[in-house]
Regions:
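Metal-dependent nuclease catalytic cores that hydrolyze phosphodiester bonds in DNA/RNA
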Residues: 1-133, 139-143
Length: 143
């Protein structure tokens, strides 16, 4: 069983040398995740939410006013700009591709997008890789 400390090098090795037999189930899972992301951003992510819930992903917001509006809603909330929606789509795609490469490089991925709850606050974890909880992030040097 592989360990997470070799993960980056194993992915780079896969990218450099390829594989003779990519696992179809990994490819189909990645494609399905990307389709789901597009549906979420294009069809269900087009309007601001009326009223939300306290979630693990928003609990750490430094602005308590923004957190209040996340939970209580704001009829005048700004719609997401096309540029912001594109960032969310790219982030979702990057997560799907990275987790595909993790699997294809021989590492164990479990609990993808598993819902968790702590003291009544719900959230989703990105994945557990080789027994380690991970959060997949994409970033740009441009801010």
């Amino acid at each position: 069983m592989k360990k997470i400390d070799t993960l980056a090098n194993d992915i780079y090795d896969l990218l450099e040398n390829g594989t003779k037999s990519p696992k179809q189930e990994h490819l189909f899972a990645m494609a399905s995740e990307i389709v789901d992301s597009m549906k979420k951003q294009l069809w269900t992510g087009t309007t601001p939410s009326k009223k939300g819930k306290l979630r693990m992903s928003n609990i750490g917001k430094p602005c308590t006013r923004a957190l209040w509006y996340d939970i209580n809603g704001d009829e005048k909330a700004e719609r997401l700009t096309p540029q912001t929606k594109l960032k969310f789509i790219v982030g979702d795609i990057v997560e799907s591709v990275i987790l595909y490469l993790v699997k294809e490089s021989g590492h164990t991925v479990t609990d993808q997008q598993k819902e968790v709850e702590l003291q009544g606050i719900k959230g989703h974890i990105d994945a557990v890789i080789d027994g380690e909880l991970v959060d997949v992030k994409s970033s740009s040097s441009y801010g």
